[in-house]
Amino acid sequence: MDARVATLADLDVVAETIQLAFADDPVWSRAFAHPDDRGVAAFWRLWLEGALRYPWVWMTQAGEAVSVWIPPGGDELSPEQEAAFKRLAESSLGRRGASYLDAVMACFTEAHPHGEPHYYLSLLGTHPAHRGHGLGMALLAENLTRIDAEGAAAYLESSNSANDQRYQRLGFALHGRFNLPDDGPIVTTMWRPGRGPEPSPIRRP
């Protein structure tokens, strides 16, 4: 997998991939149901700007697939970005939509484990034009190799049950489930314990 760390210079490409990848997602298509495309793009750009504070947003060379990680001890948004996110929600979604989005985010926060330090996979998406070639899972597998080298654990939320088995094949196990408000979809949380790097083969004289 030819992957690299994304920077702010890649924001346009990364944001387009994530926005299109999650356009039909059971959770986020409902949470962002009212804004036009420009409004939805503003949400994703702000979210990604928060993640790009860390060197853990990964992309294939042309941005066909993107993974967004928050490293141990990190936050998805700075306090200033959180305030901007709330203002954007109110202006784009209206009071009722902003209230729903706030309730959705509260569900994610409540379910998130806060014991053992871990890498948090906030987003993983493949551009629709490049789906079906395993790029997203290959990028995730590459990232996990780096996380394993640190002996760190990893956590994610699966907003689409069709992906659960794919995550399980990479070592994630069921951690829990929660329902979103107003009879919203079920989100599955998954945990991958820390592992050491693969041992080097023993060379015999």
For each feature predicted by the language model, list its residue ranges.
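Conserved active-site alpha-helix within GNAT-family acetyltransferase domains
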Residues: 137, 149-151, 160-177, 183-184
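Conserved beta-hairpin
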Residues: 49-69
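Conserved acetyl-CoA-binding loop-helix of GNAT-fold acetyltransferases
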Residues: 126, 132-145, 169
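A short beta-loop-alpha structural element at the N-terminal edge
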Residues: 2-16, 20
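Conserved GNAT acetyl-CoA-binding A-motif
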Residues: 117-119, 146-159
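Active-site rim helix/loop that mediates acceptor-substrate recognition in acyltransferases
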Residues: 34-56
